[in-house]
Amino acid sequence: MSVLNIAVSRCSPTVAFCSLVILCILFKVLTRVREDRKIRSLGKYGHQIQSKLPLGIGFLYSMVKAVRAQKNFEFWRDNIFGASGRWTVETRIMNERTIFTADPGNIKAMLATQFSDYGKGAAFHAMWKDFLGNSIFATDGERWSASRKLIRPQFTRDRLSDLQCFEAHMQTLFRVLDAGGSPLDSKHAEETPMSQGKAIDIRDLLYRFTFDVSTDFLLGQDVQSLTTPRQEFAHAFDEVQRMQTIFVRSRHFSKFMSKKSFRDSLKVMNGFIHKHVRRALSLSPQETQQKSQSGSKYTFLEAIAGFTRDPTMLRDQIVGVLLAGRDTTAATLSWALYELSRHPEAVDALRREILQTVGSDAPTYDQLKNMPYLKAVLNETLRIYPAVPYNVRIALEDTTLPHGGGPDGSEPIAVLKNTKIAYSTLILHRRRDLYPATSEKFADPAIFSPDRWLHWHPSAHDYIPFSAGPRLCTGQQFALMEMSYVLCRLFQRFERVESHMQHIDGGNPTLKADIILSPGDGVWVSFHEPKQIDSNQLL
């Protein structure tokens, strides 16, 4: 019998347990010492966020509590950045180093100048794989590059200038509005003065509208969620997204959560998409090309099926683009109408431009691209309410970020491989120090003021509603065109949109941040047509 076996056999369980604990502690200490040396050789540490409990549990508890109360923005503003006055800080959560930043230089480095050093990471891909698969939003390196090359050509001007898809669904939206839209639920029924006009939750209608547009554009099928709110595929897609968000926030604890609802909804979602994938693959690449050239209805799926015959690849890209195409557009339109309903002077200016440029006909691509005030309304909405308020990158190798290290935060901060960096576009866009001083020509940056965009433009990486660098949103122009079309058609018909939100949120909007930033209490408004149309307005 070896000396080691003899020693082990003579050890009591208590001694063995204590020895194991000591070895674990020594291992952790040695790991931290080695990590500390690497960090100091690369750069500096950032300002440390203190936690009231060990292992960052106090910080994690406060963060989860804020998320559940839909106070994520306030937590980032006050607890992460506000307490120190720094825009790049760090902490340890369950012994894992996490860096938080709202510094435009650091964000520029991650998204552009040091792009190859940062990515989604293997852990992100594993967490999202069942939902997003190997789509453009969940991958790095060659997989990401292949997805982008497949998707990008589908958003050319030729594709975007065909606005018939938008018009067809816009007419459905008008019919739903004429029928009264969604009735005000009992929770808010007594709070809203119905005598001021029929109040509807336009957010709900816009989410359904953009879902119909997206499925029509991507798959060639209108799922009709505007007229059938409980449409099975739409409901399944929503449930998968809802559960995925819960799993991500629960981190390691998600392993102990029931996934039945997620799996059942995923099965429905995948079944619907794979049916269309099989149909697209039944056409040869030559048949797909001939169909496109013949003027037949274009579908995104058939177009990309001309370049890959992998059904899983096709499914993954459809899910990724559908997620982005529906939610970001619907949320931004919801926020635009939230603010326009509180700023009648902006509605007057917007409607005046629309009537002078377009008149009463359906707008063309060129007309929509040449309305500066309409563009200003969307820019201002995305400035205050960026669609993706919080995001994460993982260091793919040992590297640095240019700002945040050292005693005053002016030196590079060291970032070891697999370190998580969380950044906030929402905080970045609301940093007062990045704007000109308030004056007659430049309104307080906390205020919704489209006019500022008529004579001011932000620095490139101070304003990133569609991300930046190589991962710049491929569907940016499609989203802007769709949003422009909706606002144009709405305000061709309606001269006024009236807010009923004062009775619900007191004028302080609830920033619901799941994946996408959306109005947490809906957007309850009423639309008013002009009592008499002046024919001179339409000349």
Curated annotation (Swiss-Prot):
In this protein, the residues bearing a glycan are N379
The principal location of this protein is: membrane
What is the enzyme's class at the highest EC level?
A: oxidoreductase
Pfam families registered for this protein in UniProt? p450
What membrane topology is annotated for this entry? Single-pass membrane protein
Extract the PANTHER family matched here: P450, PUTATIVE (EUROFUNG)-RELATED
Q: What is this protein called?
A: Cytochrome P450 monooxygenase pvhE
What species is this protein from? Talaromyces variabilis (Penicillium variabile)
Organism ancestry: Eukaryota, Fungi, Dikarya, Ascomycota, Pezizomycotina
